[in-house]
């Protein structure tokens, strides 16, 4: 894993509070194979939500070949990052929170095809040179106005999303 903090503003602009410290400890101290046991023992919604392998099912319909480059915008604690790393050639994550990026990095520390960029998408996007086959915004798009500085942040995020994927765009929406 590469954890790139070049665009990190120096402080996390959002946090779920103390539970993130607990999640950081879990990602650091337990192997992914132990997460189900930890979830069962802790009986905590945030731990279930962020560490359950079930969330990876959201990717099951995508016809990966293993040669794709994927951009995961808003990767959070890495709930689907591991599944992307298993299915794609390269995965680049963008995450605003340093703590969540560290959680993601710890839990996927054995992945050699993972790069996590910490900072605001608008700042990082300026320096992206890769073209991506797939771009995910899982659980992120609805927060666009919180981190996209624009009169129309949802349109801006969509346009940036398209720019980053133009060379290899694949539409699997069924339309």
What would you call each of these model-derived segments?
Residues 1-29:
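N-terminal auxiliary segments of SAM/dcSAM-dependent transferases
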Residues 67-76:
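Conserved class I S-adenosyl-L-methionine
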Residues 77-88:
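Conserved SAM-binding loop of SAM-dependent methyltransferases across substrates and taxa
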Residues 97-99:
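Conserved SAM/SAH-binding beta-strand->alpha-helix loop
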Residues 110-122:
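Conserved SAM-binding strand-loop segment of SAM-dependent methyltransferases
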Residues 126-135:
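A short acidic, Gly/Pro-enriched loop at the edge of an enzyme's catalytic core
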Residues 134-151:
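A short SAM/SAH-binding and catalytic strip from SAM-dependent methyltransferases
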Residues 152-170:
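A short glycine-rich, Lys/Arg-flanked "PGG" loop and its adjoining helix->strand segment in the class I
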């Amino acid at each position: 894993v590469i954890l790139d903090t070049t665009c990190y503003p120096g402080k996390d602009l959002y946090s779920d509070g103390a539970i993130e410290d607990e999640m950081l400890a879990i990602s650091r101290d337990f192997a992914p194979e132990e997460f189900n046991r930890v979830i069962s023992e802790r009986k905590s919604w945030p731990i279930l939500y962020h560490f359950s392998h079930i969330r990876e099912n959201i990717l099951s319909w995508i016809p990966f070949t293993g040669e794709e480059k994927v951009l995961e915008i808003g990767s959070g604690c890495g709930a689907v990052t591991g599944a992307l790393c298993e299915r794609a050639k390269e995965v680049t994550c963008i995450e605003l929170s340093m703590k969540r990026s560290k959680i993601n990095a710890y839990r996927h520390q054995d992945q050699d095809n993972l790069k996590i960029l910490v900072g605001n998408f608008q700042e990082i996007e300026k320096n992206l040179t890769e073209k991506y086959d797939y771009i995910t915004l899982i659980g992120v798009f609805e927060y666009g106005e919180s981190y996209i500085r624009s009169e129309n942040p949802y349109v801006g995020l969509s346009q940036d999303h398209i720019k980053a994927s133009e060379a290899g765009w694949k539409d699997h929406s069924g339309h």
